[in-house]
């Protein structure tokens, strides 16, 4: 046997008189020069919270569409303000809007660290009143990729309490 095609293994048996013996094992020729392939290294992509939110919003927008009979109520949160729009996607028009930048809210509520749940409730109340004045009773809620929790939930609940149907 050639040295390249044989492997040596150390084999000890309790029954044998010598403490160790070497056995030869031959391999088929296809395994002689075998090297495992190096697989490509797959790294996880680092996404920011904003990128994840926009991806969720894109998925939501594929399912939620505003029509003239049932426009889309869209929520946007920033660190300092909260914005809500009622949008007719067929005409690409904003039918009603409310935000913390409007004087009716910014004068009545004093907040320094951004909008709170109470502020979100006031905005939900304002957008519901604005929609009802314009004859809009049914809307499709678009949470904008944000979790339905906290300010987004408070806004939606306040809008429902004041007459909007989701």
From Swiss-Prot:
Keyword annotations for this protein?
Chloroplast, Plastid, Ribonucleoprotein, Ribosomal protein, RNA-binding, rRNA-binding, Transit peptide
Q: Does the keyword Metal-binding apply?
A: no
Pfam families for this protein: Ribosomal_L18p (PF00861)
Keyword Ribonucleoprotein present in the record's keywords: the answer is yes
Q: Which domain of life is it from?
A: Eukaryota
Report the InterPro entries cross-referenced here. Ribosomal_uL18_bac-type, Ribosomal_uL18_bac/euk
Q: Where in the cell does this protein reside? A: Plastid, Chloroplast
| Entry GO CC | chloroplast; ribonucleoprotein complex; ribosome
Q: Which GO terms describe its molecular function?
A: 5S rRNA binding; structural constituent of ribosome
Which residues are the transit peptide here?
A: 1-44
Please give a single GO biological process term from the UniProt record: translation
Q: Any extra remark in the record?
A: There are two forms of L18, alpha and beta, both with a MW of 11.5 kDa. They probably differ by an unknown post-translational modification; their first 26 amino acids are identical.
Q: What does the UniProt record say this protein does? A: Component of the chloroplast ribosome (chloro-ribosome), a dedicated translation machinery responsible for the synthesis of chloroplast genome-encoded proteins, including proteins of the transcription and translation machinery and components of the photosynthetic apparatus.
How it assembles, according to the record, is: Component of the chloroplast large ribosomal subunit (LSU). Mature 70S chloroplast ribosomes of higher plants consist of a small (30S) and a large (50S) subunit. The 30S small subunit contains 1 molecule of ribosomal RNA (16S rRNA) and 24 different proteins. The 50S large subunit contains 3 rRNA molecules (23S, 5S and 4.5S rRNA) and 33 different proteins.
Q: Which PANTHER family match?
A: 39S RIBOSOMAL PROTEIN L18, MITOCHONDRIAL (PTHR12899), LARGE RIBOSOMAL SUBUNIT PROTEIN UL18M (PTHR12899:SF3)
Assigned protein family: Belongs to the universal ribosomal protein uL18 family.
HAMAP family attached here? Answer: Ribosomal_uL18_B
Record's protein name: Large ribosomal subunit protein uL18c
Q: Which organism is it from?
A: Spinacia oleracea (Spinach)
């Amino acid at each position: 046997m050639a040295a390249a095609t044989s492997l040596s293994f150390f084999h000890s048996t309790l029954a044998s008189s010598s403490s160790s013996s070497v056995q030869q094992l031959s391999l088929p020729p296809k395994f002689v020069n075998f090297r495992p392939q190096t697989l490509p290294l797959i790294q996880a992509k680092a996404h920011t919270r904003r990128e994840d939110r926009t991806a969720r919003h894109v998925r939501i927008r594929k399912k939620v569409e505003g029509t003239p009979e049932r426009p889309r109520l869209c929520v946007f949160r920033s660190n300092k303000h909260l914005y809500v729009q009622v949008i007719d996607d067929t005409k690409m028009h904003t039918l009603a809007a409310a935000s913390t930048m409007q004087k009716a809210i910014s004068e009545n509520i004093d907040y320094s660290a951004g909008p709170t749940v109470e502020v979100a409730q006031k905005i939900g109340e304002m957008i519901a009143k604005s929609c009802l004045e314009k004859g809009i009773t049914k809307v499709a809620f678009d949470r904008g990729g944000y979790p339905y929790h906290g300010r987004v939930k408070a806004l939606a609940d306040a809008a429902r309490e004041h007459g909007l149907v989701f």
